[in-house]
Amino acid sequence: MRVLVVGGTGTLGRQIVRQAIDQGHTVVCLVRSLRKAAFLKEWGATIVGGNICKPETLSPALENIDAVIDASTARATDSLTIRQVDWEGKLNLIRAVQKAGIKKFVFFSILRAAEYPKVPLMDIKNCTEKFLAQTNLDYTILQLAGFMQGLIGQYAIPILDNQSVWQTGENTPIAYMNTQDVAKFAVRAVELDSVARKTYPVVGSRAWGATEIIQLCERMSGNNARISQVPMAVLRFMRSFTRFFQWTYNASDRLAFSEVLASGKALTADMAPVYEQFGLDPKETTTLESYLQEYFGRIIKKLKELDYEVNPTQTEGKKKKNNFFF
């Protein structure tokens, strides 16, 4: 099958590209920067320049394509807003896919998006789901909760580097999933006719709260976390303040997501029927414990090789501060 992956350079997109190639599919990637996508070409994918925010650039990438997996999203460093990329850009892509006569389309949404109409990203995801339902596409919607990869920068690195870990209290438990495992569901979605025009949760085996994750990182790293509390009132003020300036709209929209994280409503779901439908084995899915154990084991080994001190309380003689993480 000839599969177009949109957003192939991202955290999730690159795993989808790898999984699709490993499964024997011919992969084409629509990317904004050919230079940044060079590694995808080395893997065996065909790279085509284009931008979902510029509809006139989409048709060349859609030629002779059997299925589209859309993993694109606005990044925190983008000059474009979430609305421009995740709403207007998505509509451009969906319409272009329809015009090209392609039927299979995989879209990533967020679990329980319909419950948060005042949170821009959640509202946009919910509206896109409704828009897809009105098309003639054989779409599959995969509703995600959170990626394990994001926990490295949020918790693991600060704890290893003896920096502050920021918390807003006891946050919403989230069933995080490894992007490699999410990619398996995405590729299976284009292979299976039985999942057409359906919506599925794709989440980890267990929901974890912020305190539990911090304790897990402390145990595996041997360091104690320095926790700094940020009251929700402060985040709400920052969101309101950043709405005054056009160049901070993106930051404001992302701050709004803190309402979801502080709601206390767990982002999790029963995955047993989903694994059965997709023909995947839940035993092969990465657990958060194993993911963090592998990360800390690799990093601590590397630090020891570089003669860095991981725990400053055990420092003898000259202390070296670690700023090297990957």
From Swiss-Prot:
Question: Where the protein is mainly located, per its record?
Answer: membrane
Knockout consequences: No visible growth phenotype except under high light (700 umols photons/m(2)/s) where cells become temporarily photoinhibited. Decreased synthesis of D1 (psbA), loss of RCII* assembly complex, considerable decrease in PSII intermediate assembly complexes.
Transmembrane intervals? none
Q: Which UniProt keywords apply?
A: Membrane, Oxidoreductase, Photosynthesis, Photosystem II, Thylakoid
Keyword RNA-binding: yes or no? no
Which top EC class is given? oxidoreductase
A cellular component term, taken from the record's GO annotations? photosystem II
GO molecular function, one example? oxidoreductase activity
- State its Enzyme Commission number(s): 1.-.-.-
State the membrane topology: Peripheral membrane protein
Q: Which domain of life is it from?
A: Bacteria
UniProt-listed GO biological process terms: photosynthesis
Q: Does the keyword Oxidoreductase apply?
A: yes
Q: According to its UniProt record, where is this protein located?
A: Cellular thylakoid membrane
Q: Which family does it belong to?
A: Belongs to the NmrA-type oxidoreductase family. Ycf39 subfamily.
| PANTHER family, per database record | PROTEIN HIGH CHLOROPHYLL FLUORESCENCE PHENOTYPE 244, CHLOROPLASTIC, PTHR47128
Quaternary assembly: Purified in several chlorophyll- and carotenoid-containing complexes, including photosystem II (PSII) assembly intermediate complex RCII* (iD1, D1, D2, PsbE, PsbF, PsbI, Ycf39, Ycf48, HliC and HliD) and the Ycf39-Hlip complex (Ycf39, HliC, HliD and pigments). Tagged protein does not pull down mature PSII.
Role summary? Requires HliD to bind pigments. The Ycf39-Hlip complex binds D1 at an early stage of PSII assembly along with Ycf48, ribosomes and ChlG, the last enzyme in chlorophyll biosynthesis; it may be involved in chlorophyll reuse and delivery to D1 in the initial stages of PSII assembly. The Ycf39-Hlip complex efficiently quenches chlorophyll fluorescence, contributing to photoprotection.
Its recorded name reads Photosystem II assembly factor Ycf39
Species the sequence originates in: Synechocystis sp. (strain ATCC 27184 / PCC 6803 / Kazusa)
Q: What is the lineage of its organism?
A: Bacteria, Bacillati, Cyanobacteriota, Cyanophyceae, Synechococcales
